[in-house]
Every structure is written in C-alpha cells, then in structure tokens.
Amino acid sequence: DNTFSPLSVTPVNLGADVVIHSLTKYINGSSDTVGGVVCGTQEFINDLKNVNNGACMLLGSTMDSFRSASILKNMRTLHLRMKQHSFNAMYLANAFEALDIKTVYPGLKSHPSHEIFKTMFNEEFGFGGMLTIDVGSLEKANAVMELMQEKNLGYLAVSLGFYKTLFSAPGTSTSSEIPLDEQKEMGLSDGLIRFSIGLDND
C-alpha cells in the first residue's frame, strides 16, 4: 500500500509485485473523490477483472467519467505537490523537534528507520507529508488542535493528502477501537497528533 508515499517511494523498484493506492488521498489531492487503484502485471490485473472469479467483482462500482477525469487532471501536479508536502513536513518536523516535542518523521535523523528509508525513497520527492507528534496528554493534544483551527492552520480530519493541513488524535479517532492496553503496547499515547501536512507556502 503506497497511499502515504506516492513518488517518494516506488515499491516496484523495491521488489513489490502488486502496489495499491487510495486515489482519494495524495494522488487526487482535493478530497472530493473516492477511489483506489491496483497496479501489477497485466496477467495479475486480468485475473482481478475476471468476471467469473476475479476479486474486482467485490471492490465496488466503476468510477464515473467526471471523477476519473478529475483524478487524471490532478495527477499532472502530483510531482509538484509531493515536493511541497515533503518540504513543509520536514520544516515542521525540525521545528517541533527543536522545541523538544517528541516528533516521528522519517526525514529526521532521530527516526529509528531513517537510514533504511534513505535507501528506499526518491530524494527528489522527499520523505512525504505525514508526521506525528506526542504532546503528552489528550488535553494538550486537543488544545493544540483547537488552537490550530482557531488560527486557520488546518482542519480536524482523519483523512490525508489534502492541499490543506489535516490533523487528528489517533487515540480518539483512527485507533479508538483498539483496546487501551493494546494501544499502550503499540506506543500509541493519548497525546499523539497525526498530521497530514498541506501545501501552504508560509
């Protein structure tokens, strides 16, 4: 699943036989379309499309032409957008870390997989637009997110890849169905804020 890192990582070059993307996220980039894509060999795709036993029979309807055209149009700027998402995320990751806020971003040398990621990513497109900070408690996380909304610095949303910065507290949103003891084992704290960094030029 390369939804979080189109262009930044090319899984086929790393040995992947099948790559999937959510077109809803970075590839479309405007949060107005729902879709996905499966990439593989022609033989694999033909098997998926087989009307008798192909898995695509389970994946939903065919996208309408207007949405398809919208995604194709937005793909023309994907290379520019991914560079800016990555640039902004790197800037903010450095700023958060300089403030002694626990920051998780693969572009930081402090990230445990930084050196591994450097061997996999396409330098031209950076380390991607997703980062996480831990401010210590849910109360602080909520205060940060409320302040960001007041200052019009982004939107509270669990999506990603939008041109505007999106943020959410995983413990009370995307990970809320995971029991608290399992969240702790996974390193998820109440103070986590997940950011999908936008295209802002300031």
Residue spans of the language-model regions?
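Active-site beta-loop-alpha junctions enriched in small/polar residues
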Residues: 3-5, 108, 198-200
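Short, acidic Gly/Pro/Ser/Thr-rich loop/turn segments
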Residues: 45-46, 78, 138-141, 174-175, ...
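Conserved C-terminal alpha-helix-loop-beta "cap" of PLP-dependent enzymes
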Residues: 102-193
